[in-house]
């Protein structure tokens, strides 16, 4: 069965350009994870809270995230449609759950895109010698978003080429720098290997346990978004094979390469005290061993990786909006479901940009965006995995047709337990660490978004939009032996 015939079996027709291969689909997920951005932005916080031993939180979180990635990979194989979280939960638990899963994921990607663009602008404004004022950073953020929109406007092929090159530069740059620093640290014996297991003195084990949990937030914030490739399923050749591999490979490589970079930088750190309080600790470590042009090259690599993350986020969010619009699940669905001559959802692209820009106007923008984005991501993960578990346990006939047989109850239960633990951690750490003003802003923003969705849901309360009554999952069942797990 061809890709177009598979799509028709779900009740849809081919509208987007199906031109992505293995590496491009992998690059979408890897860019959204944006390992380099997370490490450069939050390394100092992790080191300050947990000491050198905090590097192992990356591995622990990576293992937990891989449980979720395995569930998502199988769902992507069974349901190769754009609008992944929306489509998956719709097939497993119905339209109501799908509506909320889709909208929460829209919030996650729009706020995430705004936050990443703001972070890039924060680097670029002082780099070009401009006054580091909030006004200049916001203007640079808008310029970044518009640039990403222009690239997306002219087709997925152009966007994928830019993203592919950026990912290759990020992987090569981070691995080379990590290996060089690791080699230098081992040759010079800057620190023994046991240094990686040291931590700040705490009066009790419980005290350090909380510090370690705090330091693990860097990994929790960074190692998500691996499922983004599923949102370009209708633009990927053989998506039932390539998207699952992209999901798993992007998460595994982000964990492996990220751990390598963390170990290399931590063993090479000249002073934990200085690095943990430095505004750009990884650049401080690089500058301690290499000349300025290497530091400038590292900053360029980070900037390229962050821009690729913005680009991939925009690609992902516009496909999600478009997929929900063709089913009548968003306002102005007819307008947002339009596809241009370049075979991209052009109206969704230019609607997403100003909405994302609005989030950068708040004071304490980074805290608010991070809170909304991270909570939205893990809540959606919970809805998807919970729907999969529900279909297995509560609806055997549905599970037989629509849930891959080897997405076992045990795997779903373990993944859901992990997600709930992360949500509890995020809630606890947000309450004890965020300022009262920022917390109020975040809660108000969440309340306004929820109220808008409820109003829209009440106004639009009619049948099931224009979507097919149920995707024809029975047309492509997995056999007992078919599994990528």
Where does each model-flagged region fall?
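TM-loop-TM module centered on a large, flexible mid-protein loop between adjacent transmembrane helices
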Residues: 87-88, 94, 125-130, 202, ...
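Helix-loop-helix junctions that connect adjacent transmembrane segments
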Residues: 11, 16, 55, 131-136, ...
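Membrane-interface loop-to-helix entry segments
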Residues: 137-191, 247-252, 370-384, 404-416, ...
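Extracellular loop-to-transmembrane helix junctions
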Residues: 37-135, 140, 144, 250-259, ...
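A generic transmembrane alpha-helix motif of multi-pass inner-membrane proteins
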Residues: 371-377, 406-485
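Membrane-helix boundary/coupling elements in multi-pass transport proteins
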Residues: 104-119, 220-236, 294-332, 367-379
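C-terminal membrane-solvent junction of multi-pass transporters and transport-like membrane proteins
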Residues: 162, 334-344, 381-434, 438-441
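Membrane-interface "cap" regions at the ends of multi-pass membrane proteins
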Residues: 1-53, 66, 70, 405, ...
